[in-house]
C-alpha cells in the first residue's frame, strides 16, 4: 500500500527521519509531505506515533483526469463499495488544477457525484455528505493531466493533541503547537537523551539528561518534552480516527498497537531526566505553569527564576543536555534580557556541548550569540514567519579556538530596512558571545 504523511513546510527532513525511525519502508521526502509504503500496520504506526505529521493518507488510486468527464469516469471505476463503510458520511476536498479543471470546488463535486453514483449502483444507497465532520474524508489531488485520490486516516489533524484541560488553560495565550514543539525538540536530540542509559558515574554524580527551556512561553515545548520523556504515543488518547470509516480498518490490529504503546509507556517510567523551565516574561511563565499543572505534568517540570545561576543550580549535574526556546512571542521590551540569558547559558561549562534550538525572528539569536547557526529552518508558527535556528555549541567552540587564539566566524550580512531598524536597537546584549 502507498501512504504519505503531510506536514508544514520546513518539516520534511525531520518527518522523513521520524518515519524511518518508526521502521517504515521506502520513505521519500517531498515538498510538504513524506511518502512511504507498507501494509495497514505501517499506516497505523504513522498515525499513532508521528509527532511531526499533520495527517496520514492512504492512496486509493491514481488515474487520468484531463477533463470533468474523465475525472468522473475514473472515480466511478473505483470500487467504493469495498472502501467506504456502509452508512459512513463522506467529504471530498480537492487541491490543484489541470488545464480544464480549474475550480477545486467543481472538481470535488464531480468526484463526489461519481462516488455516490457508484454506491447507488452497487449497494442501492448513496453516501451522505457531511462537509464539517465526515466519517471518511477523501483528498483529490490534481496536477497536469493526472489525479490521485487518498483517504485521510487521521480525521482531525494529528497536531490536535493537547490535553483538554491544558487546552482550556491556554485559551487566549500563545501556546506552541505540538508538532512545532516536536520539531524544535528533534533538532536537539531530546528523544535520544531520554533513551540514554545512565552510567555508574552518572549515578554517582547524580547526573541526568537535562532539557532547559530558556523561554517557555505558553508551555508548548514543555508538554511535548514530557510526552517524549514518558514515551507517550501522541495518538494514544485520540478517540476518533478517519480510518474507522474505511472497510479495511482492522480493529484487532489497532488495539494490538495501542497495547504495545501502553507497554512502552509503562517501561518508560524507569527513565530519569530533568526539565528546567524559565521565562523572562512573568505572564508567559504563569501560563506555562498553568498548562503543565492542568496536563498533570507538574512533577516533571522544575520552574525557576530566569537567572542563569539559578537555572544551572536547578539543572545540577548533567548527563547530556539541550537548550530550547520559543522567543517568537517574547515582548520586544524583554528581548534583550531573554537573549542575555541564553547567551549566559551558552557560556556555562556545564552546557559546553549542549545544542541550542530556538524559534526566533529576524536572526536575533544568532546575532546575540555571535555564531552562525548550524542550520536555520524557515517555519510558520501561528501563521507568522519565523526561523528555527540550531546551534551546535560543541562544534562552534572547536571552530572558535585555534592554537589558543580565538577565531570568530563572520555572520552573513543581514539587511534591516530603515523603517524597521529602530525596533531592533537595544535588543541584543553587548558581546554576549564573549567569554
Give residue spans per PLM region.
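C-terminal catalytic and target-recognition region of SAM-dependent MTase-like enzymes
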Residues: 307-435
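Conserved S-adenosyl-L-methionine
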Residues: 176-310
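C-terminal edge-of-domain segments
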Residues: 138-152, 386-391, 409
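Short, charged/polar, Gly/Pro-enriched secondary-structure boundary elements
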Residues: 41-48, 156-159, 398
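SAM-dependent Rossmann-like transferase core, predominantly class I methyltransferases
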Residues: 149-189
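Non-catalytic nucleic-acid substrate-recognition regions in nucleic-acid-modifying enzymes
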Residues: 1-136, 199
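Phosphate-coordination loops involved in phosphoryl transfer and adenosine-cofactor binding
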Residues: 86-89, 208, 271-272, 353
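Short beta-strand/turn micro-motifs composed of small residues
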Residues: 7, 279, 358-360
Amino acid at each position: 500500500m502507498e501512504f504519505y504523511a503531510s506536514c508544514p513546510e520546513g518539516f520534511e527532513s525531520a518527518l522523513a527521519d521520524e518515519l524511518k525511525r518508526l521502521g517504515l519502508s521506502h520513505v521519500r521526502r517531498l515538498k510538504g509531505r513524506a511518502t512511504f509504503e507498507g501494509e495497514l500496520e505501517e499506516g497505523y504506526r504513522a498515525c499513532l506515533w508521528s509527532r511531526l505529521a499533520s495527517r496520514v493518507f492512504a492512496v486509493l488510486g491514481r488515474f487520468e483526469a484531463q477533463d470533468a468527464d474523465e475525472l468522473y469516469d475514473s472515480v466511478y471505476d473505483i470500487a467504493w463499495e469495498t472502501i467506504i463503510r456502509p452508512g459512513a458520511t463522506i467529504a471530498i476536498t480537492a487541491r490543484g488544477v489541470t488545464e480544464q479543471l480549474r475550480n477545486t470546488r467543481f472538481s470535488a463535486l464531480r468526484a463526489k457525484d461519481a462516488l455516490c453514483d457508484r454506491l447507488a449502483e452497487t449497494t442501492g444507497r448513496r453516501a451522505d455528505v457531511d462537509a464539517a465532520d465526515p466519517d471518511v474524508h477523501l483528498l483529490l489531488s490534481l496536477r497536469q493531466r493526472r489525479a490521485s485520490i487518498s483517504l485521510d486516516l487521521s480525521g482531525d489533524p494529528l497536531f490536535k493533541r493537547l490535553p483538554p484541560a491544558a487546552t482550556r488553560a491556554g485559551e487566549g495565550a500563545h501556546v506552541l503547537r505540538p508538532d512545532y514543539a516536536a520539531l524544535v525538540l528533534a533538532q536537539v536530540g531530546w528523544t535520544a537523551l531520554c533513551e540514554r542509559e545512565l552510567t555508574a558515574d552518572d549515578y554517582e554524580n547524580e547526573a541526568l539528561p537535562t532539557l532547559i527551556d530558556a523561554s517557555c512561553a505558553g508551555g508548548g515545548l514543555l508538554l511535548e518534552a514530557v510526552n517524549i520523556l514518558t514515551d507517550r504515543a501522541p495518538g494514544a488518547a485520540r478517540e476518533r480516527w478517519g480510518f474507522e470509516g474505511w472497510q479495511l480498518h482492522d480493529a484487532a490490529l489497532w488495539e494490538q498497537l495501542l497495547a504495545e504503546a501502553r507497554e512502552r509507556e509503562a517501561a518508560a517510567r524507569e527513565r530519569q531526566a530533568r526539565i528546567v523551565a524559565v521565562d523572562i516574561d512573568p505572564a508567559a511563565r504563569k501560563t506555562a505553569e498553568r498548562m503543565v499543572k492542568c496536563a498533570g505534568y507538574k512533577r516533571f517540570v522544575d520552574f525557576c527564576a530566569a537567572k542563569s545561576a539559578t537555572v544551572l543550580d536547578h539543572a545540577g549535574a548533567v548527563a547530556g543536555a539541550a537548550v530550547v526556546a520559543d522567543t517568537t512571542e517574547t515582548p520586544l521590551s524583554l528581548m534583550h534580557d531573554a537573549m542575555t540569558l541564553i547567551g549566559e547559558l551558552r557560556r556555562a561549562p556545564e552546557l559546553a556541548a549542549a545544542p541550542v534550538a530556538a524559534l526566533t525572528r529576524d536572526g536575533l539569536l544568532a546575532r546575540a550569540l555571535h555564531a552562525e547557526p548550524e542550520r536555520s529552518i524557515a517555519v510558520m508558527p501561528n501563521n507568522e514567519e519565523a526561523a528555527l535556528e540550531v546551534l551546535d555549541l560543541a562544534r562552534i567552540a572547536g571552530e572558535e579556538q585555534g592554537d589558543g587564539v580565538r577565531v570568530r566566524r563572520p555572520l552573513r550580512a543581514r539587511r534591516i530596512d530603515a523603517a524597521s531598524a529602530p525596533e531592533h536597537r537595544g535588543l541584543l546584549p553587548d558581546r554576549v558571545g564573549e567569554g
